[in-house]
Amino acid sequence: MTREQKRRVRAELRACGQGKSDWAGVIALAMDYYEAEDPVCRRLLQLRYLDGMPEERVVAKLHIGRTTYYHKELEALSTVAVYAAAAGLLPSQ
């Protein structure tokens, strides 16, 4: 995942949290996937990006360390990027 792709995914997740993104279907797919496979990733996406909670509060609320937070965040962002690329919303670079 390139820096530009990561920036784009983060921006679209935040916009979706504010009801301003056409990525809603892609994000819903990722949330459904993580509901079954990794609830921590799902909660991280929900709290950090859709609800706009600060990183420090997300770490505390999920009872995880920063290393785990960054690992799970990258995993979740990558999954959203894969769904977005498959839908033609994110060019693969």
Please provide the spans of the model-predicted regions.
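Aromatic side chains
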Residues: 16, 49, 69-70
